[in-house]
Design a protein with these regions (language model features):
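Charged, low-complexity interaction regions
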Residues: 21-33, 54, 75-88
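Short amphipathic alpha-helical heptad-repeat segments
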Residues: 1-19, 38, 56-72
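Amphipathic alpha-helical coiled-coil segments
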Residues: 41-57, 95-103
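Alpha-helical segments in soluble extracytoplasmic regions
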Residues: 30-38, 45
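Short linear sequence elements within intrinsically disordered, low-complexity coil regions
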Residues: 13, 32, 47-50, 54, ...
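Amphipathic alpha-helical binding modules
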Residues: 70-103
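Generic N-terminal initiation segments characterized by hydrophobic and/or small/turn-forming residues
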Residues: 2-6, 20, 43, 77, ...
Length: 103
Protein backbone atom coordinates (compact mmCIF):
# COMPACT_ATOMS: atom_id res chain seq x y z
CA UNK A 1 0.00 0.00 0.00
CA UNK A 2 2.86 2.38 0.83
CA UNK A 3 4.30 2.17 -2.68
CA UNK A 4 0.87 2.55 -4.29
CA UNK A 5 0.13 5.68 -2.26
CA UNK A 6 3.55 7.18 -2.98
CA UNK A 7 3.09 6.48 -6.68
CA UNK A 8 -0.38 8.03 -6.63
CA UNK A 9 0.79 11.18 -4.82
CA UNK A 10 3.73 11.66 -7.16
CA UNK A 11 1.52 11.13 -10.22
CA UNK A 12 -0.98 13.73 -8.94
CA UNK A 13 1.83 16.23 -8.29
CA UNK A 14 3.25 15.66 -11.78
CA UNK A 15 -0.19 16.00 -13.40
CA UNK A 16 -0.86 19.27 -11.56
CA UNK A 17 2.54 20.63 -12.58
CA UNK A 18 1.77 19.86 -16.23
CA UNK A 19 -1.66 21.45 -15.89
CA UNK A 20 -0.13 24.53 -14.31
CA UNK A 21 2.35 24.86 -17.18
CA UNK A 22 -0.50 24.56 -19.68
CA UNK A 23 -2.58 27.22 -17.92
CA UNK A 24 0.36 29.61 -17.73
CA UNK A 25 0.94 29.08 -21.44
CA UNK A 26 -2.66 30.13 -22.05
CA UNK A 27 -2.19 33.23 -19.84
CA UNK A 28 -4.64 31.93 -17.24
CA UNK A 29 -2.59 32.99 -14.23
CA UNK A 30 -5.43 32.91 -11.69
CA UNK A 31 -6.22 29.29 -12.51
CA UNK A 32 -2.52 28.42 -12.49
CA UNK A 33 -2.26 29.91 -8.99
CA UNK A 34 -5.08 27.65 -7.78
CA UNK A 35 -3.28 24.65 -9.25
CA UNK A 36 -0.17 25.70 -7.29
CA UNK A 37 -2.21 25.48 -4.10
CA UNK A 38 -3.20 21.92 -5.04
CA UNK A 39 0.47 21.09 -5.66
CA UNK A 40 1.33 22.51 -2.24
CA UNK A 41 -1.37 20.42 -0.57
CA UNK A 42 -0.15 17.21 -2.23
CA UNK A 43 3.43 18.05 -1.24
CA UNK A 44 2.39 18.74 2.35
CA UNK A 45 0.55 15.40 2.53
CA UNK A 46 3.53 13.59 0.98
CA UNK A 47 5.95 15.26 3.40
CA UNK A 48 3.70 14.43 6.34
CA UNK A 49 3.43 10.80 5.21
CA UNK A 50 7.21 10.54 4.99
CA UNK A 51 7.72 12.31 8.35
CA UNK A 52 5.27 9.89 9.99
CA UNK A 53 7.36 6.99 8.68
CA UNK A 54 4.57 5.97 6.29
CA UNK A 55 1.98 5.49 9.06
CA UNK A 56 -1.18 6.42 7.15
CA UNK A 57 -3.37 6.75 10.25
CA UNK A 58 -1.01 9.21 11.95
CA UNK A 59 -0.51 11.04 8.65
CA UNK A 60 -4.26 11.54 8.27
CA UNK A 61 -4.55 12.82 11.85
CA UNK A 62 -1.71 15.32 11.35
CA UNK A 63 -2.92 16.39 7.93
CA UNK A 64 -6.48 16.88 9.21
CA UNK A 65 -5.12 19.10 11.96
CA UNK A 66 -3.18 21.18 9.44
CA UNK A 67 -6.13 21.53 7.07
CA UNK A 68 -8.64 22.42 9.79
CA UNK A 69 -6.61 25.54 10.55
CA UNK A 70 -6.88 26.64 6.91
CA UNK A 71 -10.64 27.23 6.91
CA UNK A 72 -10.52 30.30 9.15
CA UNK A 73 -7.55 31.73 7.26
CA UNK A 74 -9.38 31.27 3.98
CA UNK A 75 -12.47 33.08 5.29
CA UNK A 76 -10.37 36.06 6.43
CA UNK A 77 -8.51 36.14 3.12
CA UNK A 78 -11.75 36.22 1.12
CA UNK A 79 -12.86 39.26 3.10
CA UNK A 80 -9.68 41.20 2.40
CA UNK A 81 -8.89 40.77 -1.28
CA UNK A 82 -6.35 39.01 -3.48
CA UNK A 83 -3.13 40.31 -1.90
CA UNK A 84 -4.24 39.08 1.49
CA UNK A 85 -5.33 35.74 0.00
CA UNK A 86 -1.88 35.21 -1.47
CA UNK A 87 -0.23 36.15 1.82
CA UNK A 88 -2.50 33.84 3.81
CA UNK A 89 -1.78 30.95 1.42
CA UNK A 90 1.95 31.50 1.91
CA UNK A 91 1.53 31.63 5.69
CA UNK A 92 -0.59 28.45 5.71
CA UNK A 93 2.01 26.63 3.63
CA UNK A 94 4.85 27.82 5.88
CA UNK A 95 2.90 26.85 9.01
CA UNK A 96 2.11 23.41 7.62
CA UNK A 97 5.76 22.82 6.77
CA UNK A 98 6.75 23.91 10.29
CA UNK A 99 4.31 21.40 11.80
CA UNK A 100 5.62 18.64 9.55
CA UNK A 101 9.25 19.39 10.40
CA UNK A 102 8.49 19.17 14.13
CA UNK A 103 6.85 15.77 13.68
Amino acid sequence: MKEALLTYLNERIDWHKREQTRLRGEYRQDEAAHVQIAINVYNIFLSTYQAMKFDLGETLRRFSSIVSNWDESHRVACEHGDDTKKFVEEIKFARAMEIIQRA
